[in-house]
Regions:
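Active-site-adjacent beta->alpha loops and helix N-cap segments on the catalytic face
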Residues: 3, 32, 55-63, 83-92, ...
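Active-site cofactor/substrate anionic-group-binding motifs, chiefly glycine-
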Residues: 41-94
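Hydrophobic faces of well-ordered beta-strands that scaffold small-molecule active sites
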Residues: 19-25, 45-49, 77-83, 101-103, ...
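N-terminal glycine-rich phosphate/pyrophosphate-binding loops that anchor nucleotide-derived ligands
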Residues: 22-38
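Expand to "…catalyze enediolate/carbanion chemistry for C-C bond making/breaking, isomerization
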Residues: 95, 139
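N-terminal amphipathic alpha-helix/helix-capping segment at the start of soluble metabolic enzymes
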Residues: 1-24
């Protein structure tokens, strides 16, 4: 069908009283399997491009893979950059066509992470893309 935005997928799922599933992609084989299974169950999906995949495949090729798979199915696919470590990788993903970004600045100080998160938020607004941020961690004392 097509590449879509996370906002649209979530709105459609809510209207249909349905769900959206996200899968971390490691390569062609699992990406195509995820899409095939989603197509069979008529479930729109998020294909997540994490750091592991990006070590072995350029972002442009990852997006091209997601785009090709979207043309071979009846479902909608959200291309998602997972754990983008800095502004540049997030911008590059948006320039290529990713519609959803997860910025992970958790290794920075809280203040620096928050400032970077706000800059990336402003960037995603220009692209009409969704943003998820990792601001830190939760600790539980037992």
């Amino acid at each position: 069908m097509s590449i879509d935005s996370l906002t649209n997928l979530l709105n459609c799922a809510k209207t249909r009283n349905n769900y959206v599933v996200g899968f971390v992609v490691q390569g062609w084989e699992d990406a195509s399997s995820f899409v095939r299974a989603a197509d069979e169950t008529e479930t729109d999906i998020i294909l997540q491009s994490g750091p592991g995949l990006r070590k072995n495949m350029p972002l442009e090729l990852i997006y091209a893979m997601f785009e090709k798979l979207s043309g071979e199915t009846n479902i909608k696919i959200v291309p998602h950059l997972d754990h983008g470590e800095n502004y540049d990788i997030c911008k590059k993903a948006l320039d290529i066509g990713f519609t959803s970004i997860m910025y992970d600045g958790s290794k920075l100080s809280f203040k620096e992470n928050l400032n970077q998160s706000l800059k990336i938020y402003e960037l995603t607004q220009k692209y009409n893309a969704c943003l998820e941020v990792e601001l830190g961690f939760l600790a539980i004392m037992i």
